[in-house]
Amino acid sequence: MRRALITGADGFVGQWLAKTLVAQGWQVTGTAWHGIPAVGTLSADEQRAITWEVGNLTAARDLGPMRALLGRANPEAIFHLAGMSYVPTVGDDPVTALETNVGVGIRLLEAVRAERAAVGLDPAILVVGSAEQYGRHPHEAMPLPETTPCAPRSFYGATKQAQEDFALAAARAHGLRIVTTRSFNHCGPGHAPIFLLPALIQRVREARRTGAATLPIGNTETVRDYLHVQDVVRAYLALIEGGRAGEAYNVCSGRGVTVGEVAALVIARSGVAVRFEQDPSLLRPADVPTLVGDNTKLCTHTGWAPTRTLTDIIDDHWHAAS
């Protein structure tokens, strides 16, 4: 039985990844900051199949606890997903975000290096980053390949870029088998409504309940690249198996869609008679107007390809919330 360690297994993507690994017969150890997640994405049987390590990975400043975790899990593959993922929250507390999004990853990689020297542990490691690392580029530059210069405009993007820099430096300097991602927008059942697409779905569901004719929305011209969470999980598994160590990969659909188009599709799929109206309070002045990725490298190196559409994302999320 193959063994995997997932940091942030209690998160949105972490639960879907754990679910998939359990179904494939992996022995899964998952870290959870706020406790074992409620039954939902994971069934009760899937929950029980996972060895949970509950606690705050930022609490310890030495490598002891992280090395002990690696000793218990003895992973062949590590998926480092733990971190702060909501851009405004990171902006409000960048010091904590730096420790969470960068410090934890550094300690994890240093612990792997120490365990390799001590007992020969040599796992494949996936470090998950963000398309926010790219920052702002002109519309005609889309879709962005991995060779595009990274110039993040948010503290969140900056922490993820720092995480990638340290991870790839560890791969070059110490030969750790690390692959990093620049993951674009992804969604699906279980995604929190603080993020755009699930927030739109939640507002339309509320309009169906109340009979509201209009709903608030931010900038409808912003263009983003969406993947179904199940395609994201497939990409992460493909990269653990076939990604090239020391390299970064876009995880994306390669297609851009405006927020207005997403909102219109949510309404169309719901069948609710409602329309969105722009609310100035929801506008983010620092937003990157267009962010679309080129997935050629991921597809070529691993054979991965997206299988789910934006309509699938909306339908799955809508029905899961019913």
Would you name each region that the model predicts?
Residues 2-3, 310-322:
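Amphipathic terminal alpha-helices
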Residues 4-24:
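N-terminal Rossmann NAD(P)H-binding glycine-rich loop of SDR-like oxidoreductase domains
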Residues 26-37:
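Conserved glycine-rich Rossmann-like NAD(P)H-binding loop of the short-chain dehydrogenase/reductase
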Residues 46-61:
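Rossmann-fold cofactor-recognition segment
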Residues 57-100:
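NAD(P)H-binding glycine-rich loop region in Rossmannoid oxidoreductase-like domains
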Residues 92-110, 121-124, 132-180:
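Catalytic helix-loop patch of NAD(P)-dependent Rossmann-fold dehydrogenases
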Residues 137-142, 165-225, 229-238, 256, ...:
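NAD(P)-dependent short-chain dehydrogenase/reductase
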Residues 214-215, 219, 248-249, 257-264, ...:
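C-terminal "lid/loop" region of Rossmann-like NAD(P)-dependent oxidoreductases
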